[in-house]
Swiss-Prot record:
Keywords: ATP-binding, Chaperone, Cytoplasm, Isomerase, Nucleotide-binding, Plasmid. One of its GO terms (biological process) is protein refolding. This is Chaperonin GroEL 5. HAMAP family: CH60 (MF_00600). Belongs to the chaperonin (HSP60) family. The gene is groEL5. GO terms for cellular component: cytoplasm. It catalyses: ATP + H2O + a folded polypeptide = ADP + phosphate + an unfolded polypeptide. Forms a cylinder of 14 subunits composed of two heptameric rings stacked back-to-back. Interacts with the co-chaperonin GroES. Together with its co-chaperonin GroES, plays an essential role in assisting protein folding. The GroEL-GroES system forms a nano-cage that allows encapsulation of the non-native substrate proteins and provides a physical environment optimized to promote and accelerate protein folding.
Amino acid sequence: MAAKEVKFGRSAREKMLRGVDILADAVKVTLGPKGRNVVIDKSFGAPRITKDGVTVAKEIELEDKFENMGAQMVREVASKTNDIAGDGTTTATVLAQAIVREGAKAVAAGMNPMDLKRGIDLAVAEVVKDLLAKAKTINTSDEVAQVGTISANGEKQIGLDIAEAMQKVGNEGVITVEEAKTAETELEVVDGMQFDRGYLSPYFVTNPEKMVADLEDAYILLHEKKLSNLQAMLPVLEAVVQTGKPLLIIAEDVEGEALATLVVNKLRGGLKIAAVKAPGFGDRRKAMLEDIAILTGGTVISEDLGIKLESVTLDMLGRAKKVSITKENTTIVDGAGQKSDIEGRVAQIKAQIEETTSDYDREKLQERLAKLAGGVAVIRVGGATEVEVKEKKDRIDDALNATRAAVQEGIVPGGGVALLRSSVKITVKGENDDQDAGVNIVRRALQSPARQIVENAGDEASIVVGKILEKDTDDFGYNAQTGEYGDMIAMGIIDPVKVVRTALQDAASVASLLITTEAMIAELPKKDAPAMPGGMGGMGGMDMM
């Protein structure tokens, strides 16, 4: 076991705080409508330009092990907020930095870290309650477009595209974002389906950066039982290899020898393949496999029907233009099923919905109906260069997540105003002075997102924040894009409650851990082995024959 270095107390916290500051300072320049770009060097290809907080955070790795621990903890804030709300990563990072800074000062002044943490938790709980109480629900397509526009850094067309996509496939519908081959960004609705099962092995991934397996123009094998015997699968695998097309296997499970062999073949590059578990359980699994079969023009391989795996031919496999698989979901786009068959299946499910008396069954049938009939909206992102397309795609992904979050929990005034207003409404008291200090830490930290947005726009933060707080109306704030004061919601500057709430909760959670840290342990850097000695002595000056 390698030797470790241990740091305690103040020296540990100082190192950690430095790491937090390096990461947060790089991320927070992207906040707001006048946020700056960050350029990231890539080991191959052109540098990447982004205004996406989590993308910047993921690129930062520090040389000093202790500083790096601090940076990675805050990176975790950005990642977690991104996973839950899909946006608000920069806000979460700014809040975490503010809470850690104030907390470190309080601990250095001799306050009890555990009481500070309790005070922080009390204040956060009250702010969350306040945010949910003043949320406004989103109803119209215009409001959806507004949210999308703001999250896409003020690009109106992106907001309109997202609103149109949500109108076509419903708020819970599947919307995917792809890179286009042209300079224009366009929206297309295709017949598709998404279910909540991800890849069985991360080795199936084709895009390691996004951890996604994409299969273009794929065959789909649908099997209702477990697959563990490789011999039975060989004929169909060989037939697919001959075509040069990728294969998706959907089965109850793929395990043991079968899964290992598929992974090895994928890694060697002989077979483009991915495997996922079939969605649902019991009879519903059979029904959902049948739905996928109808959508893709394939057949479910079932021994009840007398079809053995050994005798499967290519025409029994389904086909789809594109399959996209993440850790949690599989999306099948543009299946090769006949329109008349799909319509027949939809009518059959509608009839079952009418007949059923169970609310649970009705809900599950409606889910199946939405998957079959709803389709998938595809936003194809265009641009003049590859760098521009990637940057725009990041923004559309953010905007899409923000819009979904807004539809779920409603909206509050944007521009950091909602948190700013909540900061003066905190009335909760702790059990002692140290807990009250924790409450005050949150009170001050809640001003940091608004201040950062104003600073990034090149204005004086203290003056702007003071002016906003002078007015007593919840919606009054500052438009950093135009430099005007007014009603934020009327100006279309809004934030989804889910994004603001998640950013605050995640930031407070990780910041509390950092404040209560008393010791840090890291591996000592390995000493380089001594170099090989030079040649034998006394051999200089030999005559060359």
